[in-house]
Amino acid sequence: MFIFQDCREGSQFTESGDTMIFKFEAQAPKIDEKAYAFNTATLIGKVELKEYASVWPGVTIRGDVNRIEVGRYSNIQDNSVLHVADKYACIVGDYVTVGHCALLHACTVEDHCLIGMHSTVLDGAVIGHGSIVAAGAVVTKGTIVPPNSLVAGI
């Protein structure tokens, strides 16, 4: 495990071979003992992985200026990025699948959703309960997707 004292202080760290976990401005990620993060995933700052959440190879979850939550039984697949904005946190509900190479930026994904591979969900967007965002789709800033919807295209 890489644990930096603070991202802004330089390269003080410890290594034990697991996930890269970084503090940011004294905020360290919180990982439930039943959650899993692959050893090439990077978790930074105000990040919480809840019970049975999983994070896979190459994922970056950066809670620097706001918080990120990954809900129970949710999975963030290979090379996806979750980030925040000053105004918006990034919240992933329970039982959510985020496909490979997706970008979730300062948005909310409610429970039981599927976010397709290479899709993008932007600031302030809300993906309603049980919805699907198709592979490659772009959900623009501030879009509210109703529950049980399918989103495709831009």
Model-derived features: positions:
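N-terminal glycine-rich anion-binding loops that anchor highly charged ligand groups
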Residues: 44-50
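A general secondary-structure boundary signal
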Residues: 51-52, 94
